[in-house]
């Protein structure tokens, strides 16, 4: 990439505005991607815009401060003296309501401070207003979609899906045939806002996003080209340019994490593909009856397990479970997931099927058992189970003793589980090939640099 550095030595008038969504796992991967671009374009100015809370978190833990990236704090949209109503989505809705004007205000500050007009907008794909804003500034617009290509296509097709389902209630929608290469979908498989909860601010934002993304100079996505060619082709037909610049856990700098609970050392003591790893992410915990069912299933099946557990396991798990399973299981408050999934002892990952977790499974070559909760997780489960055939969803999307034991025995002990393992290893090889020099993701990243910094 050194040729870019040589070419860009004179490009000190370029100014890239980066607009980050402050909730969930959105801002961190966008910053990682921008840091990688900024490293290749040291004379280009990058202004990173996000809320104070998120900026404080992102930049306080960053070990590498690049001189050409400066962050600016954007108002979070909460009114003065705000008191939470108890609705966890309320801060998101308030941010969305005010974000367009709040971003504009701080962008003006950055332009005045640097003396450089904005030449490119790199935004979270959620920010549909990037199309008009870039046009006003005579700048390029490059949005980043941090989830999978299949879920993005449902948002591009929202009007088509709503037309097909008409005015039916969600429970009356039996099947929807809309994603190429996917089986027919139920309404419950689709992300919120496509045909349900369509009037809430988040759904409105996603609907507008699907309509506006075709105006972008390029749409970058956290994926690689061979994961689903049919979806890839469909998105290519809708956008000016689709750039696969993932998987991010291979293509962007990864923060070093500690293993304070000794998970990797514990795994070293076990045989290949013998351990069940369990984590449902940092947002949702299964309800009490599902936690009980999972604990009882693990105890009965007898597989060794590591469980990254939110909350107090003594309070939330069956009485005596910790004592009875202490030689077989390890329950920790936090686990180095990426490193665990790369460990040869791990045989399956019981997960909520967030997109980052799916990609981490692929890079680790570990099949998955999915218990989806919300968002794109239902679609991700269908992708891994029915399309890629590298995992299985629990029956009816609920953790019961029967559904868990069935899924564990299928993935860990059956011939079908062995076939899943073979398929995900092939997909892993494709992911690594994509990020090699002249690989599809590597070449798309080169194109991304050219667009953003020229």
Curated annotation (Swiss-Prot):
UDP-alpha-D-glucose binds at residues 335, 337, 352, 355-357, 360, 376-377. Keywords: Glycosyltransferase, Phenylpropanoid metabolism, Transferase. It comes from the Eukaryota. Highly expressed in flower buds, flowers and pods. Lower expression in leaves, petioles and stems. Its EC number is 2.4.1.-. UDP binds at residues 25, 282, 308, 334-335, 352, 356-357, 360. It holds the Pfam family UDPGT. Induction: Strongly down-regulated by wounding or by methyl jasmonate. Myricetin binds at residues 89, 155, 192, 202, 375. InterPro entries: UDP_glucos_trans. The keyword Transferase applies. GO terms for molecular function: UDP-glycosyltransferase activity. Pathway: Secondary metabolite biosynthesis; flavonoid biosynthesis. One of its GO terms (biological process) is phenylpropanoid metabolic process. The keyword Ribonucleoprotein does not apply. The active site is at residues 26, 124. CDD domains: GT1_Gtf-like. Disulfide bonds: none annotated. For the flavonols kaempferol and quercetin, a significant activity was also observed with UDP-galactose as sugar donor. The reverse reaction (deglycosylation) is observed, but not with formononetin 7-O-glucoside. Catalyzes the glycosylation of flavonoids at the 3-O-position. Glycosylates the 7-O-position if the 3-O-position is not available. Also able to perform 3-O-glycosylation of anthocyanidins. Belongs to the UDP-glycosyltransferase family. This is Flavonoid 3-O-glucosyltransferase. The gene is UGT78G1.
């Amino acid at each position: 990439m050194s040729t870019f550095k040589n070419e860009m030595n004179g490009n000190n008038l370029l100014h890239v505005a980066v607009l980050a969504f402050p909730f969930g796992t959105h801002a961190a991967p966008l910053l990682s991607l921008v840091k990688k671009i900024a490293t290749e374009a040291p004379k280009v100015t990058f202004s990173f815009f996000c809320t104070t809370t998120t900026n404080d978190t992102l930049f306080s833990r960053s070990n590498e401060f690049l001189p050409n990236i400066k962050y600016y704090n954007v108002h979070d949209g909460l009114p003065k003296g705000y008191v939470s109503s108890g609705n966890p989505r309320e801060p998101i809705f308030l941010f969305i309501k005010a974000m367009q004007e709040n971003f504009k205000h701080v962008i003006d500050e950055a332009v005045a401070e640097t003396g450089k007009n904005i030449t490119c907008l790199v935004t979270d794909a959620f920010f549909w207003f990037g199309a008009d804003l870039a046009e006003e500034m005579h700048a390029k617009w490059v949005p980043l979609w941090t989830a999978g290509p299949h879920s993005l296509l449902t948002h591009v097709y929202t009007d088509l899906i709503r037309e097909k389902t008409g005015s039916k209630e969600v429970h009356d929608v039996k099947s929807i045939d809309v994603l190429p290469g996917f089986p027919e979908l139920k309404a419950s498989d689709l992300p919120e806002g496509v045909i349900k909860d369509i009037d809430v601010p988040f759904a409105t934002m996603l609907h507008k996003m699907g309509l506006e993304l075709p105006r972008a100079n390029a749409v970058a996505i956290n994926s690689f080209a061979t994961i689903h060619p049919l979806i890839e082709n469909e998105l290519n037909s809708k956008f000016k340019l689709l750039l696969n610049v993932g998987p991010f856990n291979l293509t962007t700098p990864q923060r070093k994490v500690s293993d304070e609970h000794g998970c990797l050392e514990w795994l070293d003591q076990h045989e290949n593909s013998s351990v069940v790893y369990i984590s449902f992410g940092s947002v949702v915990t299964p309800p009490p009856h599902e936690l009980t069912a999972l604990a009882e299933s693990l105890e009965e099946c007898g597989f060794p397990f590591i469980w990254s557990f939110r909350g107090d396991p003594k309070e939330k798990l069956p009485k005596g479970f910790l004592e009875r399973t202490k030689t077989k299981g390890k329950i920790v408050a936090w686990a180095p997931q990426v490193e665990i999934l790369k460990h040869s002892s791990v045989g399956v990952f019981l997960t909520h099927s967030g997109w980052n977790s799916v990609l981490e499974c692929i890079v680790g070559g570990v099949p998955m058992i999915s218990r989806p909760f919300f968002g794109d997780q239902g679609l991700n489960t269908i992708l891994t189970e029915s399309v890629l055939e590298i995992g299985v969803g629990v029956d009816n999307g609920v953790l019961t003793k029967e559904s868990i034991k069935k899924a564990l025995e299928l993935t860990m002990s059956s011939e079908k589980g062995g076939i899943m393992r073979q398929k995900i290893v092939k997909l892993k090889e494709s992911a690594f090939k994509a990020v090699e020099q002249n690989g599809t993701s590597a070449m798309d990243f080169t194109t991304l640099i050219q667009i953003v910094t020229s």
